[in-house]
Regions:
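Class I S-adenosyl-L-methionine-dependent methyltransferase module
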Residues: 2-11, 79-187
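A short acidic, Gly/Pro-enriched loop at the edge of an enzyme's catalytic core
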Residues: 201-213
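S-adenosyl-L-methionine
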Residues: 2-46
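A short glycine-rich, Lys/Arg-flanked "PGG" loop and its adjoining helix->strand segment in the class I
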Residues: 227-240
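Conserved beta-strand signature within the Rossmann-like core of class I S-adenosyl-L-methionine
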Residues: 213, 240-253
Length: 309
């Protein structure tokens, strides 16, 4: 319980206003900021395994929805496991409408905060299930909801960058509509995933996987460091004929040969394709997050994929 006690103490300190405990990756994302629905069909999850990063837990839920059955969630944020189990217990315990009311910041209007967000009443409906699923996750959130106002928890432990309701639904197959949500509800008790807290760049990872999702890590590191990570994963963790989501890039509808010098390195596509030429075997333009919002089909976002032979 040593690591758990440390995580809870830090979370409580942040809620109390001791912001010196806030680290670079200490905030959770309530939902994915990627259009997972736009790229998940490029991967085979039918009874396959997945290693993924992502503090929102949505990579885990969408992969399980698509057939994955052996999932490892690897993330630098120590609260990631607790939040993933909170979502799973909510899916088991709450209706589609209740889930939306509990987790979404905006429901009816992007200018009016949802007053039921992190409702103690809705938490009480799911907390017995959470206790059964993962006792540490139950203790973590039960303590926080007992001590702090819901708005304090949401504003201080979670990133404030949450999109509109229609975008979140569009990015997640399991939230697309009530039928999809209920389909996941009917099978989610079978979900098992392993959580590992650590820095994927520096840590040794146990196991071999059919699929690996690196999410948007490519936007927060150098191309050379990303190349080293891909080499490590390819040699030690990726099965033959396995696939890696190397990176997710937003708003890539510009001419990739004409970019601004001050953009992040990975967006300089001629350089990226050269440095990662041994790994980028496919790239796909997909319906972007902004496209979902404006109901357009510009395919503004880009995914980079590696297929191992």
């Amino acid at each position: 319980m040593g690591e758990f006690n440390s995580n809870l103490y830090k979370a409580m300190s942040i809620c109390d206003g001791s912001f010196r405990y806030i680290e670079e990756f200490s905030r959770l994302y309530t939902f994915t900021t990627e259009n997972i629905s736009g790229y998940i069909d490029y991967f085979d999850f039918d009874n396959k395994s997945l290693l993924t990063v992502g503090s929102s837990g949505d990579q885990v839920l969408n992969a399980f929805y698509s057939g994955a059955r052996d999932i490892t969630l690897f993330d630098i944020n120590g609260y990631t496991k607790y939040y993933a189990y909170l979502k799973i217990s909510a899916i088991i315990s709450l209706s589609y409408k209740e889930f939306i009311l509990f987790f979404f910041k905006y429901v009816d209007s992007p200018f009016e905060r949802n007053k039921y967000m992190f409702s103690k009443q809705l938490f009480n409906k799911m907390k017995d299930t959470l206790r059964i699923l993962d006792y540490e996750s139950y203790l973590f959130f039960d303590e926080l909801f007992s001590l702090y106002d819901k708005d304090i928890i949401r504003s201080r432990l979670f990133d404030d960058d949450e999109d509109r309701c229609v975008v979140i639904k569009g990015c997640n197959n399991y939230l697309k509509d009530e039928e999809s949500y209920n389909r996941l509800k009917s099978i989610i008790r079978k979900i098992t995933f392993r959580y590992v807290n650590g820095n994927i760049f520096d840590s040794d990872i146990n196991g071999k996987f059919d699929n690996i999702f690196l999410s948007n890590l490519c936007t927060i590191t150098s191309l050379e460091r990303l190349k080293e990570l891909l080499k490590k994963l390819d040699e030690n963790n990726l099965k033959d004929r396995g696939s890696v989501l190397i990176g997710y890039l937003w708003n890539t509808h510009f001419d990739e040969n004409n970019y601004k010098d001050n953009i992040k390195e990975v967006y300089k596509m001629p350089i990226t394709r050269e440095v990662l030429k041994d790994y980028i075997t496919e790239s796909h333009s997909i319906i972007g997050v902004r496209d979902i919002l404006w109901e357009e089909e510009e395919k503004r976002d880009l995914v980079l994929i590696y297929r191992k032979k």
